[in-house]
């Protein structure tokens, strides 16, 4: 079973069950969720979600389901981004959301997203460090790569 079909099946399972567990896939939520190693516990969506919740949703016109963090709640929907990404998705509608991350198993350890102090600290630090990570990966690192390539070309 592919990771994509795993989440699609999860969305179908949530219509029948209150809570499900799925193996994670992809790198957009690293370092919190590791690809093919961690298990996400997702519960059916009930009511309006809040900032820092991690919904299971699909983009309009797509059958692909994704887990990303809510950055902002707007009157039109949600602004969402993966922890390991820089591009935000705007106006994700409530009808596109089928579930929300309740907890996850990391290395066999159960981490509750509502009660764990370590998880809440991770969310705070991840959000606070975003400008520095964006600056490093978006500007400094590519510039250093170009300088390195220029130096290598001149030496050969």
Task: Mark where each language-model region is.
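Acidic/glycine-rich C-terminal interaction modules and beta/coil loop segments
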Residues: 58, 62-156
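Short, low-complexity, intrinsically disordered N-terminal peptides in bacterial proteins
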Residues: 1-5, 153-156
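Feature for secretory/organellar precursors and membrane-associated catalytic proteins
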Residues: 2-86
């Amino acid at each position: 079973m592919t990771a994509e079909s795993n989440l699609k099946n999860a969305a179908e399972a949530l219509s029948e069950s209150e809570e499900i567990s799925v193996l994670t896939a992809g790198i957009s939520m690293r370092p919190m969720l590791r690809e093919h190693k961690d298990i996400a516990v997702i519960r059916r969506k009930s009511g309006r979600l809040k900032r820092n919740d991690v919904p299971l949703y699909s983009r309009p016109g797509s059958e692909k389901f994704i887990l990303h963090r809510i950055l902002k709640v707007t009157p039109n929907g949600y602004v969402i981004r993966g922890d390991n990404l820089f591009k935000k998705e705007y106006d994700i509608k409530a009808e596109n959301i089928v579930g929300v991350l309740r907890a996850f198993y990391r290395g066999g350890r159960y981490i509750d997203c509502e009660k764990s102090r370590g998880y809440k600290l991770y969310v705070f630090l991840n959000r606070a460090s975003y400008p520095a990570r964006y600056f490093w990966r978006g500007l400094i690192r590519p510039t250093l790569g170009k300088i390195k390539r220029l130096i290598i070309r001149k030496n050969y």
